[in-house]
Amino acid sequence: MSQWQDIKDFHEKFALSYDGPPRDLPTDLSSFRLGFIFEELDELIVAETKTEVLDALVDLVYVIMGTAYLQGFDFQEAWRRVHAANMAKTRGPSARSQEYDIIKPEGWTAPDLSDLAGE
């Protein structure tokens, strides 16, 4: 079973399923979801143990994927496209001057997600 299926199962269990085209969330639901994301991010910021960090990371991804699900996005295909574009990047110096930085090489193209967003 995939994480995406887990997200679908969770939302179906609580009668929150959505199986339509990509959509904007109603303002109240969007505000709730964004608040929920910030709450989980705050848990990550204040985490003091590796266990707390891991829990916060999983919760954050879970809520974000749930939000994508409720918007009707094909998250798996979007992930595939973004991953492919990221794999075309290279490691090198950037304006941030971080040794861990990954940069967009000459000719790099961002993934087109417009069809998945219904635009």
Residue ranges, per PLM feature:
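Flexible "arm" and connector segments at domain edges
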Residues: 1-57, 61-119
